[in-house]
Amino acid sequence: MKFNKLSEQNLSGKRALIRVDMNVPLKNGVIGDDTRIRASLPTIEHCLKAGAAVLLMTHLGRPTEGEPKPEDSLAPVVARLSELLGKPVRLIADFHAGVELAPGEVAMLENVRLNKGEKKNNDELGRAYAALCDVFVHDAFGTAHRAEASTHAVAKFAPVACAGLLLSAELDALGKALQAPARPLVAIVAGSKVSTKLTILEALADKVDQLIVGGGIANTFLLAEGKAIGKSLAEADLVEDARRVIAKIRARGGDVPLPADVVCAKEFAETAAAATKNVAEVVADDMILDIGPDAAKQLAAIIAQAGTVVWNGPVGVFEFDQFGNGTKTLAQAIAQSKAFSIAGGGDTLAAIAKYGITDDISYISTGGGAFLEFLEGKELPAVAILAERAQ
């Protein structure tokens, strides 16, 4: 897919409108984690260095359109951004009369989700945004799966529409992992429900050499292979779907390696006693909360041989240390592997942070839903419009 890149644009004296993702956790006006603000800095600084006037826009939370409340304001975000940039950042409540900005200055439009028509991708609002710039820069991969006025309509009407540094890097990394992967391609897909990730599992079944499943998803796959799982979280109605995924991969010469041993408990609790056992020994009141050490070793060996690893989801309840060994072992295997690795999803990022392997993953995706939809092979509307504008 070809799209215009920010790095190719002449920005001297131009007005750059950048759609960033600064939807940070806020409690009582205090930012809980500023990772997303920091992730946007390279694109902002690139535009400033190139001589542009920089206008930013982002959403924050889920406010009601047309009904601004103090807690929906970007004021705390703007204050933090100003600290990080070391320069003032203006917050603009009303942009309809235009925005006066000199090259080297930075301003932020108030929360785009307060604007009527934002969620519905309203063309009139898109035109109003586009009128504020010479170059529109999309740099919010986390919102790329949504067609909204600040991600899609604006890109239709801006004089130039391009991908920012973060979005370009994200698309390059995902393309490398899925469109032309170094083989073997190993995907780790874990989570509580097959139903939420069935389309991903089916899409990956056509691409991967090894599909490692974990969590409640693995329990459903164990059921599909005729194993007893006690009172573990699973979806009995999706057993046939799981069988179909297994058959599809095996028909291509790949596999879904399921654990031969597991770590069980009688209750789901931080204080629960962990018991490691062979899958054949699982009894009616057991809950499987992690893969066993033998399974972890076997999967780590598969990862060690991989050319590409795509990771979405921890394989056990790693928040409780006694059920974290499986995720920790796989995380360390990915960190030590020579494979190109890409990881995404909130729980996955928490596991990466917990086991201190951030610097050992080739690419950490910033997009939750967008990352998953890309894995499914779905077209991301905000990326598709950039490709269209590049023609």
Swiss-Prot record:
Cytoplasm as a keyword? yes
Which sites bind ATP? 197, 319, 345-348
One Gene Ontology cellular component annotation held by this UniProt entry: cytosol
Identify the domain of life.
Bacteria
Pathway it acts in? Carbohydrate degradation; glycolysis; pyruvate from D-glyceraldehyde 3-phosphate: step 2/5
Which keywords appear in this protein's UniProt record, sorted alphabetically?
ATP-binding, Cytoplasm, Glycolysis, Kinase, Nucleotide-binding, Transferase
Gene3D superfamilies, alphabetically? Answer: Phosphoglycerate kinase, N-terminal domain (3.40.50.1260)
One GO-annotated biological process of the protein = glycolytic process
In terms of InterPro entries, this protein maps to: Phosphoglycerate_kinase (IPR001576), Phosphoglycerate_kinase_N (IPR015824), Phosphoglycerate_kinase_sf (IPR036043)
Where does the UniProt annotation locate this protein? Answer: Cytoplasm
Instruction: Name the Gene Ontology molecular function terms of this record.
Output: ADP binding; ATP binding; phosphoglycerate kinase activity
Q: What is its EC number?
A: 2.7.2.3
Q: Does the record's keyword annotation contain Endoplasmic reticulum?
A: no
The protein's annotated catalytic reaction(s) are:
(2R)-3-phosphoglycerate + ATP = (2R)-3-phospho-glyceroyl phosphate + ADP
Listed under subunit, the entry gives: Monomer.
Protein's name according to its UniProt entry? Phosphoglycerate kinase
Species this protein is from? Chromobacterium violaceum (strain ATCC 12472 / DSM 30191 / JCM 1249 / CCUG 213 / NBRC 12614 / NCIMB 9131 / NCTC 9757 / MK)
